[in-house]
Amino acid sequence: MKTTIILTCLILAIMIISQSFVAKGTKETEAHAYTVLKVYDQFEIRKYAPALFSGVKLKSKGYKESSGKGFRMLAGYIFGNNEKNQKIAMTTPVVMQLGDTTKMFFKVPDGYSIEELPQPNDTNIVFEKQEEKIMAAIRFNGWADDDKIKHYTAILKNALDKENIQHTNAFSFLGYNPPYELVNRRNEIAVELIQYSNNK
């Protein structure tokens, strides 16, 4: 019995230490910069800086069907599946535009231009420059799935309608954690706003 207790405590200690290192790595990962313009009860308004993204369009719909395939394709590119066998740093969050078609995006680290990026060996991967934009975002914890994404999308949409804030109706899922980070997971649903005024 004593041996079992000791082993259990040892395993728990290892898990806690390993997860603390994972969390530290997540915090230090370059993120898409934004400024919070206004905070509401259920969501906040952000101004995102211009950024360059690598992206891929997926035939499958929904988070469950698309997330694994899209991640593997884009991760392959930044891990060296490109014309120069060049590794590119991971950034956060991973963005998924969910709708009739699904797109996944990784932000390109600051300092790169499209001309400087190595061409992907996978021709499905494209680069996209996104200009400064205003977005509304709602956060939720835990593991994401299609039901949670639909639930929080509906909450955000209803909250925006209640405040008479116009939006594009093109919602995205933002995931901030690697799959091996088990606690304190951060997920968001975001949508670009139309002619937003900070006076609302």
Stretches with model-predicted labels:
Residues 2-200:
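A solvent-exposed interaction/effector surface
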